[in-house]
A protein has these predicted regions:
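Surface "functional belts" at beta-alpha junctions
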Residues: 1-95, 123, 128
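Acyltransferase
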Residues: 89-138
Length: 138
């Protein structure tokens, strides 16, 4: 489970409507993914990634619920670019919540448990320092 999936779990009872959690990644980008719920379980439609808001909105083809701290930053731009396809979660559902992480964990299959040692961090893009070092070093 990742933070984006946990954010999608803020809205678990909406089935068959895509949920797009977005987190501000700075530099006019958002970390995002797209999930759909079926039978109370989140299914990944688009894997987590980092994109510009313009690139993300160009891929939105149906009504989609946006949730996450990126909504506060990019709401107007998303509304303009996605038009009627943009649906925004209520403010109290846009932040990460421990209860949503617990809900996401409860959806795991019975044999899908991980030990703490098996957990790993997933970085969707290199840090600014890494990118600048690569630019300097070719």
């Amino acid at each position: 489970m990742n933070t984006l999936e946990a954010l999608a779990c803020n809205i678990p009872l909406v089935e068959d409507i895509p949920i797009c959690p977005i987190m501000d990644a700075r530099r006019s980008q958002v970390y995002n993914a797209i999930y759909k719920f079926k039978d109370g379980k989140a299914h990944t439609v688009v894997e987590p990634r980092a994109l510009s808001v313009e690139e993300l909105c160009a891929q939105i083809r149906e009504k989609t619920i946006f949730v996450g701290d990126g909504v506060n930053v990019y709401r107007d731009k998303i509304a303009t670019l996605c038009g009627d396809n943009a649906v925004f979660a209520p403010a109290h559902l846009t932040l990460q919540k421990a209860s949503s992480v617990a809900y996401a964990a409860s959806m795991a299959d019975e044999n899908e448990y991980l030990t703490p040692e098996a957990l790993e961090v997933i970085y969707l893009r290199k840090s600014q320092a890494e990118r600048e070092r690569e630019e300097r070093n070719g």
